[in-house]
Each structure stands twice: as structure tokens, then as C-alpha cells.
Amino acid sequence: MAQTSVSRPRAETLVNDFVRSVYNWMAIGLCLTAVVALYVSGNEALTRLIFGNSLIFILLIVAELGLVFAISGMVQKMSAGTATFLFVLYSALNGVTLSFIFLAYTQTSIVSTFFVCAGTFVGCSIYGWITKRDLTSMGGFLMMGLIGIIIASLVNMFFRSPGMSMVISYIGVIVFVGLTAYDTQKLKNMAMTQPVDADGSVVRKGAILGALSLYLDFINLFLMLLRIFGQSRD
């Protein structure tokens, strides 16, 4: 009994440290993305190079997708330092490709949408953490919704339908609201089931993987909301 009473505070400390690490790395990724996006959008030569050459833009997108798949699928096979570097690199590259939002939307609408997104994200994350309901069953439904969004977005690249784009955005908000709660509960389960004597590098890699999931939820939720509430510069 004495050992249990000693280990419980220790376990709670490990959970808190792990969750704090996840959200810290997520925040670092978001800040880096924002800084890079602002810098690129303010550099006319860079914007012409990136958005004036479709090949370069496509290569950047492919590189980003490759980094996401590498971190998600091979994180256990790489060192903690490599996983951290790839996450930071992905955040920076994402800032490059997302710099277009500062060219397409007014800064006022970007800022206001960010706060709406942040509030929504926090609320969904809190729900995912405190709810007693098992959200595992939502995973398959949400992944089907995500695949549907990707396919519909690719199709709409050819049709360029504003109405279809708006429908995709509303569905996207629903999907990423659900994914935020779902991924937060997964994060909670990961934090509470990690061994007390877990290796530091293993914990770091888990934190990077969790940060990537929440980062993607936040970024995509923000982009969907921006399509709905953003005010065009035109």
C-alpha cells in the first residue's frame, strides 16, 4: 500500500509532464509556422518563386506529406532528436506553403479567425480529456470524413465551385472538431499508460507524435474556418 501511495503522485507527475511537453511542442510548431508564413508573405521574391512556379509548390506539398508520413509511421525507429528535427522542419515548410493566407485574406479576419479557432480547439480538447465516453468508435467515421474532404477538394480544384468549397469547409470544421477531441483522448490514454520507468527518448518521441496530431487538427480547423469567415483582400 505504501508503494502505491508513493507511485501515484509520481505517475501523475509523469502524465502532467508528458501532456505539457505535447502542448509545448505543438505551440512551438504553430509559432514557427506563423513566423515563417509572415516572413515569406512579406518577401515578394520568395512569393513569386513559390507561388509563381507550380512545380516548386507541388514539391513543397509532397515534402510536407512525406514528413508527416515519416513521423507518423517511423517515429519508433528514429531517434528523439531526428523526430524533433523533422517536426520542426515540417512546421517551417508548412509556414512556407501557408504564407498565401496573408496574401489572400485581410489580417483582421486572419486574427479573428485564429481566436475563434483557438477557442474551439481548447473547448474540444478539454471535452476529449474529461469525457467518460469512449471516442474510439468515432475514429473510423472521422477518417472516412477526412478522406471524403480530400477527394472532394481535389475534384473541386478542377470545377472551382465556391458553393462546393463552402460545403467542404463546413464539413471540414465538423471533422476536425471531432478529431481534436478524439486525438486528445488518445493522448490522454497514451500519457496514462506509459511506464513509470519509460526511457526519456521514447517519451519525447511520443510527445512529438502527439504534438503533430494536435498541430494538424489545429491548422486544418483554422483553414476551414478561414474559408468560412475570412475576408478576401480583393
Tell where the protein language model's regions lie, with residue ranges.
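A hydrophobic alpha-helical transmembrane-helix feature that marks the membrane cores
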Residues: M1-D234
